[in-house]
Amino acid sequence: MEALRQRIEAAFEARADITPSTVDASVRNDVQNVINMLDKGELRVAEKIDGQWHVHQWLKKAVLLSFRIFDNAVIDGAETKYFDKVPLKFAEYDEARFKAEAIRVVPSATVRKGSFIGKNTVLMPSYVNLGAYVDEGTMVDTWATVGSCAQIGKNVHLSGGVGIGGVLEPLQAGPTIIEDNCFIGARSEIVEGVVVEEGSVISMGVYIGQSTRIYDRETGEIHYGRVPAGSVVVSGNLPSACGKYSLYAAIIVKKVDAKTRGKVGINELLRIVD
């Protein structure tokens, strides 16, 4: 794997000279192998090691190289046609393979080749971009978007219209991560490499980027780029220093553990915020 990484790194440095017609066959094969391994979940752009998320930048480079290497081609979408560089993940699936992988894909859901979809997932009409990792037991609801290289944990619910930001450039930026057992409410947007830690509940219409203040009303602490584990978060505002105006913030109204989540429904957690 180290040799493959080094070859991808070298090709990326020479990317300005790479086109579909000039690319060396070995580089094309290396990039295609990485895309295939991402597609199967054998590799992932980010993984948690000893409690910390680590980003494998060389895999992001391979994904970016794929846009230099592969030319546009007609893609058959049953009811229509597409013209793009990236094929669709399920283009060659048959009934046996869908059953073997235990995934349910509702018509018009779109998943690009190079993204991983775990067992027992449900994809409503939604969009999953390449490099993304969607772990088992997750629901991607209608019109939700999982951006490039985003990492979605086990048993996550992405509600209708949710946007999970992608990140290929700038290259050093970390992917947006939703950890296990999280609920993201309808029309919320989590972007710019924000990490929503395990067991958190995000209410409807909450927008969180790296510059968003995430205010814990119990402690007064302000977080940036990270929603602590077990947080229940709603949209709100914080006053300016001069007291003349307020600015948007995400407010942690309470903390819950797995035991509480098991006893109390998501709607009840969000309803009682006082």
From Swiss-Prot:
Main localisation: cytoplasm
GO BP terms, alphabetized: diaminopimelate biosynthetic process; lysine biosynthetic process via diaminopimelate
Pathways per UniProt: Amino-acid biosynthesis; L-lysine biosynthesis via DAP pathway; LL-2,6-diaminopimelate from (S)-tetrahydrodipicolinate (succinylase route): step 1/3
Pfam family of the protein (one): Hexapep_2
Sorted UniProt keywords: Acyltransferase, Amino-acid biosynthesis, Cytoplasm, Diaminopimelate biosynthesis, Lysine biosynthesis, Repeat, Transferase
Disulfide bonds: none
Enzyme category, top tier: transferase
InterPro entries per the UniProt record, alphabetical: DapD_Trfase_Hexpep_rpt_fam (IPR005664), Hexapep (IPR001451), Hexapep_transf_CS (IPR018357), THP_succinylTrfase_dom1 (IPR023180), THP_succinylTrfase_N_sf (IPR037133), Trimer_LpxA-like_sf (IPR011004)
Chemical reaction(s) catalysed: (S)-2,3,4,5-tetrahydrodipicolinate + succinyl-CoA + H2O = (S)-2-succinylamino-6-oxoheptanedioate + CoA
Keyword Repeat: yes
Subcellular location: Cytoplasm
Summary of subunit composition and partner proteins: Homotrimer.
Family: Belongs to the transferase hexapeptide repeat family.
Protein name listed in UniProt: 2,3,4,5-tetrahydropyridine-2,6-dicarboxylate N-succinyltransferase
Gene it is expressed from: dapD
